[in-house]
Swiss-Prot record:
Catalytic class of the enzyme: hydrolase
UniProt keywords, alphabetically: Disulfide bond, Glycoprotein, Hydrolase, Lipid degradation, Lipid metabolism, Secreted, Signal, Virulence
Pfam families associated with the record: LIP (PF03583)
Active site: S205 (nucleophile), D352, H386
Gene: LIP3
Single Gene Ontology MF annotation: triacylglycerol lipase activity
Protein's organism: Malassezia restricta (Seborrheic dermatitis infection agent)
Protein name: Secreted triacylglycerol lipase LIP3
Amino acid sequence: MFPPLWKFTLLCLFLLACTSAEVLERSSKPQTPDKDPFYDPPSGWEEKEHGTILRSRKVDIAFFQIAKVKYKEAYEILYRTSRSEEDQPSTTVTTVIVPENAKKDKLVNMNVYVDSNGARCAPSYVLQRNAKLATDPALSYQQVLFSTILDEGYILTVPDYQGPKRAFAAGRLEGHMAIDGILATLNLKELCLSKDTKVIGYGYSGGSIATGWAASLQPSYAPNLNMVGWTFGGTPANLTSTLEHLNGGTPAGFAVSGVAGIVDEYESVADWINDKLTHKGKHALDFVREHCTVGIVLRYPFTNILSDSFMKHGAQLLQSPIMKKVLGTLNMGVRPDETPKAPVYMFHAKLDEVIPYGSAHDAAKRWGDHGADILFEEFTGLVMGHASTELLNLPNVLLFMRDRMSGKPFIHGYEHKHTDNPLEDPGVIAKGFDALAETIKNAIDNTVGMGDKHMKAKIEQSRRRRIVS
């Protein structure tokens, strides 16, 4: 059974809505990663093994940067990691949250969706108490998920998986940084975790890029990790099809952020594109590098990144040899030697308006063909929007985590399941998730709305205001 979280959740959601553009004046405010010396690695860091701790500190965590969260202790770890290639050293930070009832042999790698490029969007900053109140619900919306997993007694490690350049959508980089965040957490002496600690990786939407690639790369990059499962949904498994799907639509701002992330990670793309961007295109990339999700999505609805107003000969953006070469390496499930070894539970709404369903399904099927044990659940209900699906499916995610942590058997091979609404699934209802289901429904109704109707309306209102002004 679960504690009655809904009152606290609704209060926080209300405060978030009422103070979205305000700064809470408090003492001892943390600094953003681009200004905080904690993020600057010590000399000689490049020679360290990936996953090596370079620096750590205790921090005070608060969801929504307002309310004190029930937890025993929290740490930030600066660690050595890799960019897209293993021989490209880098560093980043993960935030470790230890619940009061911590199970010292169970760890969850939680890759929250950042979906943006600004320094102040990094989880390690936004999660800290007294940080500026984020205008984005990316972390705040996942309040129920954080609380529920912590209530299970699982230690959380939440990496800044986009790295110091905040390279959103650079999947291989994100996968390496997520894996090394796990290694660094296991190496933190204060936690006294065993190397045999059972680990599960989770991510949704932009966070599923990190999780999906971590699942793919872990068997070769960190084979000694005791991964017992991966679960992710709303997955941009094929970056080319995702950018094409987003382009010109309501959530086109994500496409702008994705292009900026690829440009900032791949020098070959930067060299090719920088003299081709128009003033509008350059301004757009500069804007997303300084802002977070909501600001970006509200600023760039219906933007066409394949137009000549964005880039000279804009239609060539995704078809140029340089771009095709890079994007071709960012499709999940293509290489048989990049197949998850631990059980995978993957889920996606059939009517997802942000991330194309077909690409995610194709990746899951290919992984199955390559030998992965994978359950792919397709949600067909009209209320299953991109944003709302994550919370609506929380009971299934939690059941998967419980079963993997307890060593229960999983399916062999590939299995495809069809469900209308997970909260109405008899199997979920039978598990006694009544209180959690009520929390989820209230949280969705007060944020994005069922089928994401509130979120879509807000974007449309912003677009109309921009036209008028």
